[in-house]
Every structure is written in C-alpha cells, then in structure tokens.
C-alpha cells in the first residue's frame, strides 16, 4: 500500500532492508539505534499524488472519472449541430474551470524535534498500486480529452468569427448592390432625358398641332415615369431596410435565447457534478483513513515488538534499559500524535469544505458576470451597427430623392422654356404666313 495517499509522515528518514545490514538512528533519540526492518522506511511524501495548490494547469482539477467521461461523450455525440456543439463545448470548459479545485492529501505532521514515520508495505498491498496506476491512466486520458475539447472550442470560435466576417461582407455587398442599382437608375434616367431631348427636336420639326399633342404626351409620360421610378426606388429601399432590421432582431433574439439556455444547462450540470464529487470524495477519504489507521497501528505494534526484541539480544544491559525507556516515550508520543492527528484531520476537513464552497461560489459568480457582459456587449454592437446602417441608408435615399427632384425641376424648366420659344417662333411664322396670304390672293 502506498503511504503517500494520505500525505505520509513527512521529514522522516528511510530504514534500509536487512540484506544491506544497515542500522537507522531514531530521529527522537540519536543515541538509540535500531536494526533495519523489511517493509519500513522513512521518506518524504511521494510527489506523484500530491496536488500543488498553486498550480494553474488544467490537470490539477480532478473529477470523478465517470462524470468527466460522460460529459465528454455527451459533447461528441451532439457535434453535428453548430449551436449544440458550441453549448456543449462551453459547458465542458466551464465545468473543467469551475471544478479546478486542488485537493490536498491529508498528512500526519508532528513537531520539528520529533519528525514522523512513513510506512510502506509493498508486498501486502499490490491492489492499491494497481488502482493508483489505473487512476493515473484515467487522469492522463481525461487530460487528453480536455485538450481535445479545448481545441474544438478554439475551432468553433474561429468558425463563429469567420461567419461574422462573412455576414459583414454580405452586408457590404448588399449596400454596394443597392448603390449600383441607384447608379443604373440614374444612367437610365439620363438616357431617357437624352431620348426625350431628341424626340423634342423631332417634334419641333413637325407641325403645330402634332407638336402640341406630343408635348402633352411627353409631359404626362415624363411625370408618370419619374413618379414610378421614385416610388419604385423608395419601396425598394424601405423593404430592404425593413428586411435588414427584422433579420438583425431575429439574430439578436436567437443569440440571447441560446446564451440563456447555455447558462441554465451549465448551472445544472455544475451543481450535479459538484454534489457527486463531494459525496464520493468524502466516502473515499473516510474508508481510506479507517483502513490506514488500522494497518498503521498493527504495523507499528509489530515493528516496535520486533525492534525491541532484536535490540535486547544485540545490545548491552544499559542499552536494553534505554530501549525500554524509549519504547515508553514512543508510546506516549504516538498517543499524543494520534490526538494531534485527529484534531488536525477535523480541522483540514473543515478547511477543505470551506475552500471548495468558496471556490464554487466564486467560479459561478465569475461565469455569470462574464456571460452577462458578453450578452450586453453583443447586443450593444448589433444595435449600433443596425442603427448606423439604417441611418446611412436613409440619408443616402433622402439625398438621392432631393437630387432627382432638383434635376427634374431643371429639366422641366428647360423643356418648358424650349417649348415656349418654339411656340413663339411658330406663332410668328404663322402670323407672317397669314400676313402674306392677301398679297398672294390679290
């Protein structure tokens, strides 16, 4: 059994095996020596199972293997849909972050003058080493899965950014297309103006009656054409603005609802996983401590009896008397250590429970604040972009309508002045013809 599961006895020295023939000096009484006993060593706590409290790596947070594996399987099962993939990846990352709580092994400490004993019985507990190796393998596999989940989250984040860029490109293309349509309408209007000017020149060459009829038709056609074009352009811009605003509202509503669902799901999963982890950890610690205490008491008793027996046979009468006194002192020290250990154990349990509760509350608060800030920022950006697009489109439309009206007014004035000049010339010619008719008759 690995004595480092519960911290071991720190600041102790190692007793070598009997084959080497070495003897170890007692840390409490330097002049009392003991022969080495097989299976007993003094060593510091093993660093393999001690979790560093200040370590910031994701591998320091240990969850129950079943809970983490089930959450990873759930994440990969729903990866076909974009929204579900995002929510699952966020839930898994948040659960990994919130449960990143280092658990300290419980160690049996003593005063600096005495040290402590760390017992390791490798032949009697092979099952514990197997379970420790399996636990290390599970932890490594869980770390690999968490790294894969982190990569999946980064990939999804890049996809979301690319989608937002595509959305902005499409919006720019839409505005550019509308500008091109406006330019084409202006070109068509100029073509109609040129065509109407040419027709006006042709009408000037025709007779007075045909000219008046054509002028009336031209005026009506010009007014109806300009009015239809203005109405069509105005309807197109209004419909485009309404569609864009409706689309932005739908996107904002869907995003808000999705974030709320993700937050609720994350809270529920974290609550269940934390409760399960605390229950399982408490049960495991209780069972392991009881078993460790029984085995340790038995080993201490056997070790002390064998050590005293060998020491009595090998040492002189004076050393034998000293060993007896040392044995009594050790029993008193063990009793005191046992009382100190019980007090320290209760104190450590209270500290661990308080630390876990404080960490869980802090992580929940930070997660809620981050999600709320992200929601508010995204809403503000979307509303600002929508307002700017609507305002810019409205200003361009108003400017275009004003320009068209001004051009129509100028063209109408020119046409009327030209028509008035033509009519005055025609009237003068008719007057001249009427004046010359009596002379011809005479």
Swiss-Prot record:
Residues 211-414 are annotated as: Homodimerization. The keyword Protein transport applies. GO terms for cellular component: cytosol; membrane; nucleoplasm; trans-Golgi network. InterPro entries: CCDC91 (IPR034592). The modification Phosphoserine is found at residues 43, 46. Involved in the regulation of membrane traffic through the trans-Golgi network (TGN). Functions in close cooperation with the GGAs in the sorting of hydrolases to lysosomes. This is Coiled-coil domain-containing protein 91. It comes from Mus musculus. The gene is Ccdc91.
């Amino acid at each position: 059994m690995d004595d480092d599961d519960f911290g071991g006895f720190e600041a102790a020295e190692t007793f070598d095996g009997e084959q080497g023939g070495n003897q170890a000096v007692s840390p409490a009484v330097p002049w009392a020596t003991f022969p080495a006993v097989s299976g007993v060593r003094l060593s510091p706590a093993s660093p393999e199972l001690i979790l560093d409290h200040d370590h910031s790596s994701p591998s320091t947070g240990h969850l129950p293997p079943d809970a983490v594996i089930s959450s990873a399987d759930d994440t990969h099962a729903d990866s076909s849909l974009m929204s579900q993939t995002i929510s699952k990846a966020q839930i898994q990352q948040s659960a990994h972050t919130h449960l990143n709580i280092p658990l300290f092994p419980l160690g049996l400490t003593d005063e600096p003058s005495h040290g402590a004993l760390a017992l390791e019985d490798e032949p009697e507990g092979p099952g514990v080493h197997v379970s420790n190796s399996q636990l290390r393998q599970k932890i490594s596999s869980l770390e690999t899965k968490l790294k894969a989940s982190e990569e999946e989250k980064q990939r999804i984040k890049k996809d979301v950014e690319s989608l937002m860029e595509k959305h902005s490109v499409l919006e720019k293309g839409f505005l550019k297309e509308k500008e091109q349509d406006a330019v084409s309408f202006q070109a068509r209007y100029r073509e109609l103006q040129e065509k109407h000017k040419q027709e006006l020149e042709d009408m000037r060459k025709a007779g007075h009656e045909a000219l008046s009829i054509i002028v009336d038709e031209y005026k009506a056609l010009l007014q109806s054409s300009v009015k239809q074009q203005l109405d069509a352009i105005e309807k197109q811009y209004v419909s485009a603005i309404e569609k864009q605003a409706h689309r932005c509202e739908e996107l904002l509503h869907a995003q808000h609802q999705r974030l709320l669902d993700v937050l609720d799901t994350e809270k529920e999963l974290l609550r269940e996983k934390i409760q399960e982890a605390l229950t399982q950890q408490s049960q495991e610690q209780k069972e392991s401590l009881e078993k460790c205490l029984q085995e340790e008491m038995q080993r201490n008793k056997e070790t002390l009896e064998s050590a005293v027996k060998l020491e009595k046979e090998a040492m002189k009468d004076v050393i034998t008397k000293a060993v007896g006194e040392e044995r009594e002192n050790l029993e008193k020290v063990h009793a005191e250590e046992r009382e100190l250990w019980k007090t320290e154990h209760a104190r450590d349990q209270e500290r661990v429970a308080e630390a876990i509760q404080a960490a869980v509350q802090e992580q929940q608060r930070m997660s809620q604040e981050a999600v709320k800030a992200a929601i508010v920022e995204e809403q503000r950006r979307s509303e600002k972009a929508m307002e700017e697009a609507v305002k810019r489109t409205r200003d361009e439309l108003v400017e275009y309508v004003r320009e068209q009206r001004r051009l129509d007014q100028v063209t109408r004035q020119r046409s009327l002045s030209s028509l008035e000049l033509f009519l005055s010339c025609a009237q003068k010619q008719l007057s001249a013809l009427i004046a010359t008719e009596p002379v011809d008759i005479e």
